[in-house]
Amino acid sequence: LSLKRTLVGLFRSHEGTSDRAKEPALKTRYYNLTKDKGWEEVSSTLKKIPGYKVLHEVQSVGEIILEKKTAFGRTLDITVSVLNTSPSRCAVDIYSASRGSLGDLGANYRVIMRLYDSLDKKLGKHKLD
């Protein structure tokens, strides 16, 4: 974890991925899977990660809402979006926000990296660069 990430985390209590992210690690992930197959794989993978609780799933809009408690007792609200980009391709974006007013010291960034790492392990053979 870089010093810059920690400094940003002093003030910011959210992090998200997108196509336009300046940092490569925060770019949207694309997989060579239909949206339905991508949804199944992402949903089942997220349910198996210790420390994360799936609160809500809305397959029609491709959103999975998770919650994670940090070691310091803060709660992170995480939204994972599985989007259709073509008939045989889907995209996965993650948004994580801390409850409370103080910065997260990079916790949301680490959560996104952990979730993407788990998804890449499970879906690596389908990943597109």
Task: Annotate each language-model stretch with its function.
Residues 1-129:
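Ser/Thr-rich, low-complexity intrinsically disordered terminal regions
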